[in-house]
Amino acid sequence: MPPPAPGARLRLLAAAALAGLAVISRGLLSQSLEFNSPADNYTVCEGDNATLSCFIDEHVTRVAWLNRSNILYAGNDRWTSDPRVRLLINTPEEFSILITEVGLGDEGLYTCSFQTRHQPYTTQVYLIVHVPARIVNISSPVTVNEGGNVNLLCLAVGRPEPTVTWRQLRDGFTSEGEILEISDIQRGQAGEYECVTHNGVNSAPDSRRVLVTVNYPPTITDVTSARTALGRAALLRCEAMAVPPADFQWYKDDRLLSSGTAEGLKVQTERTRSMLLFANVSARHYGNYTCRAANRLGASSASMRLLRPGSLENSAPRPPGLLALLSALGWLWWRM
């Protein structure tokens, strides 16, 4: 193979103006527009600037930058109508152009073509545009009844192809992929779910959240009975968990109670609990009370007592069958 013609040695420098990256071509030129080696790759992030430079010498008579088959610059002559592409340097040693605010449409093959006194030569660089991952669509907030199914969708775009991960913020549960399927959902699975996407282009991933609300019927979690003397204040308390929040009602025997001076009591209800307040306990107030918590999915009830001090009755209701069990144990002890 004959040695390369004078001036045939070329380096192609591709530099990111913002990132300060540089790529230098690997060797000698291909002759007569025949490319015997693959083009160098030059990667830049969307929105950054890219500088493409040909390093030449005094033997070069004509030089041009092309994108695919379109001439961008031939010497000082501008051929492109894109205002983002401009001539940066044109000297006997260097011919450089600048592309500002690089977009996906700029990705592709760029060719530096020049003419020496003997023949034409070219070298190439392939511009790769990376796009940070971002979420373009995500499910709206979801409300479902306990036992139902939920599908959450999170669509992300970016180059390279981004990963998508779903995470439940309450317990850290994670799932890979754009779609998160939850079958037979339970109340403990309610809360915020976060979609996170990343492709390594930016240090910070993109993330968005979806609130999942699980409806379920009331469950009474705590009750408080009282043992109070005549003329003193007393309080009975009932707590229930439910979504939507439960509506509370109080009963004495089978009679629905309400706040009022005639009854001598007051019903005070907050989000998850209700209290029956007695400002001045009288004899007619003693007895059994029932708290009922209900929403559109169901209801739950619990009993409690307001007792006199010194009463032999236990203020806490005993489980069914406990009295019978105690009686049987006492009879066995007496027989021994």
UniProtKB/Swiss-Prot annotation:
Q: Which SUPFAM superfamilies match?
A: Immunoglobulin
Q: Which family does it belong to?
A: Belongs to the immunoglobulin superfamily. IgLON family.
Domain of life, source organism: Eukaryota
The intrachain disulfides are C54-C112, C154-C195, C238-C291
Q: Mind telling me which InterPro entries this protein's record contains?
A: Ig-like_dom, Ig-like_dom_sf, Ig-like_fold, Ig_sub, Ig_sub2, Ig_V-set, IgLON_domain
Look up keyword Secreted and say if it applies: yes
| Record's keyword terms, sorted | Disulfide bond, Glycoprotein, Immunoglobulin domain, Repeat, Secreted, Signal
Give an example GO cellular component term for this record. extracellular region
Recorded hits in PANTHER family, A to Z, give: IGLON FAMILY MEMBER 5, IGLON FAMILY OF IMMUNOGLOBULIN SUPERFAMILY-RELATED
- Keyword hit for Repeat: yes
Task: Report the glycosylation sites.
Answer: N41, N49, N67, N137, N288
Where is it mostly found? secreted
Record domain Ig-like C2-type: where: 33-122, 132-217, 218-307
First and last residue of the signal peptide: 1-30
What is its subcellular localisation?
Secreted
Biological process (GO) annotations held by this record are: motor behavior; neuromuscular process controlling balance
* One Pfam family cited in the UniProt record for this chain: V-set
> What's the name of the protein?
IgLON family member 5
